[in-house]
Amino acid sequence: MSALSRWLLIPPVSARLSERYQGYRRHGASPFSAALGCLWTILAWIVFPLEHPRWQRIRDGHKALYPHINAARPRPLDPARYLIQTLWLVMISSAKERHEPRWRSFARLKDVRGRYHQWMDTLPERVRQKTTHLEKEKELGHLSNGARRFILGVIVTFSLILALICITQPFNPLSQFIFLLLLWGVALLVRRMPGRFSALMLIVLSLTVSCRYIWWRYTSTLNWDDPVSLVCGLILLFAETYAWIVLVLGYFQVVWPLNRQPVPLPKEMSQWPTVDIFVPTYNEDLNVVKNTIYASLGIDWPKDKLNIWILDDGGRESFRQFARHVGVHYIARTTHEHAKAGNINNALKHAKGEFVAIFDCDHVPTRSFLQMTMGWFLKEKQLAMMQTPHHFFFPDPFERNLGRFRKTPNEGTLFYGLVQDGNDMWDATFFCGSCAVIRRKPLDEIGGIAVETVTEDAHTSLRLHRRGYTSAYMRIPQAAGLATESLSAHIGQRIRWARGMVQIFRLDNPLFGKGLKLAQRLCYLNAMFHFLSGIPRLIFLTAPLAFLLLHAYIIYAPALMIALFVIPHMVHASLTNSKIQGKYRHSFWSEIYETVLAWYIAPPTLVALINPHKGKFNVTAKGGLVEEKYVDWVISRPYIFLVLLNLLGVAAGVWRYYYGPENETLTVIVSLVWVFYNLVILGGAVAVSVESKQVRRAHRVEIAMPGAIAREDGHLFSCTVHDFSDGGLGIKINGQAQVLEGQKVNLLLKRGQQEYVFPTQVVRVTGNEVGLQLMPLTTKQHIDFVQCTFARADTWALWQDSFPEDKPLESLLDILKLGFRGYRHLAEFAPPSVKVIFRSLTALIAWIVSFIPRRPERQAAIQPSDRVMAQAQQ
């Protein structure tokens, strides 16, 4: 290259071109690409006046105008990319000039929309102010109970007749479209309204559309003339009916969350009851259990009214010695029947307290746990059980493997943030096995913890409700623990839950038997139905293949009618759930959670339906490590099989599109869209199965807590603790950090009005941020440290409200990215022969995408006079 340039060009130009060539090579360009880049540069110098100020502005704004083209590393077809992007820039610049008045009108519409949102936000307060003085006039207290029931009956009857007409009235396509447009308009009007009225309105609209869809499916969409189409259609209809039942029951369950608040305890402590704290353990490491015991020792409750018990089903001498050392009770069984339930029932024979609080051995209670929960027991004598959330300070496999910890609500947030609160409204709160208090008298009446199923907790609460006792739920986290360490452990835990809930459905069905109210029966039914989602989810993941591979019409209707019924059903359900559940479950994430579990919970739930006594209790492992990032090929095998099946459907769909009957084109397109959506969801499931590296034994907790450090020379510096673990802390010194790595300092933390000192060593100094490692602590110091950190009353309270607002379209985009990420991981960890194919496909897709024009960055102003862009800026 240099010899040729010296022969053709004058020395200064040749030297400059040689420098450019070497620069291209240093940035990774191939010799051919670098030489071709130099050639395009020469042509640009010849054809365009690059020294003109206009071209200089383009050159200076190259990164903004051509964000997908790396000028320092040219590719052979970059001129084509420059040309396509330049034409795109000219088009959007011209469109902007041509439609400027229209954009201004859009701005005015946006302003009107903002005013509408502001008006909606203030509507409840204005209504309250205008109606306060009319409250007495509107009272119906003068009416008899019979008159009230009559009025209510008339309203309900009229509403049911109207709903029946709306659901069953047949429409032609145009009428159906207008009807849906009206409902959609109402939904958009009310969705911004704060308060529960808008949620109720959205539920009514969603139920109207969904019930109408189900009616249409049963009456108009089954092909009775083709056996294959009929069978496939009935299978899909079964799955859709299941989803519709869960949707209706779910709306009922959370229509009016109670949001129970604490009740103050009597000022006279002599009136406070005695409480036993049970910490059952089987094979967990002692280090996992220690923090729970240390925190329990610091619970704010009279010491003569509090007894702490370690229930060791492993019979380990180290646990016995630890219990004796810290002054708590220890119980070990000689036999181990009925697992955790049997362990607790055995301890009930020894404990004599009026109440029993139960914590899993990794759940660390806060100091305020009993003061927050016990007031309700003294107020309501029929209250048998108070449940609080299961909060985790460590990411579960979904959060860790996807990097979504504290960015997206986790799988359990919906249940503990909303569903249990909704259950509380209907007096149907479930006992969840930990972080709960139970009154001994009713527990003894039902024979202790239920042992007939592997979900002994929910079965116990069902028995208490059958006896006429009540339950309660408080949505304020009062304990925190460890999540499952791996996806396989997580799935194993969910399999046990699913099997247990189906066992209850078979052995003690809440729909039958005495003692339950209708609302309680429905709440329990929905909880059990939730774990039957495996088979319906697998049906949804394979349903479009029935048409693409077997030519079976699973929905026997024109594609236009399918769109007019299916899309509104899905959109209204998504919009309503986003409004109700947005703080606790972002849109489309349920698809990922259910897909990951579907294959694994389908067989055990089916077996439990047939033989409810089959199956055993499995202990969920906690406190493990993941030393290297890897794909769990065993877990991901079903997802990959479903991916291949859907790819086969894509191939069949492409063939049908080009060679099938013309009147099936729209049906093929709809089926392919469904398949591509399934592929995205399955890609997300694959992404979850890639276990991220986790080698930290002491899990860090983010927090903002005041503290101070004291040097050995007596100098004291205030600081803020921004994270802590059982082995150290991260702090930010308020001012310049005057400490050195390796230096020993004392950390000062407060609990209430008392200050505690902990010996530490500086292990890292970055500006004013300092990493501290705890020096060996005495037992007393360790107890104090846990109570100053993990057991603080305010440590977990704000976590559940820190998630961003759900935005369905943004959430859908996240799911799309997640799906592609899963396929990238397959390429990364696949065997070499498969990896070559993946890399080739990825490179081909990336090469095609590189020609797609991009919108310029905001800092690049496109001037009308600059419409002729340079093909090269060198």
Annotate each predicted stretch with a short phrase.
Residues 2-271, 523, 533-537, 660-689, ...:
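N-terminal membrane-anchoring/stem segments of glycan-assembly enzymes
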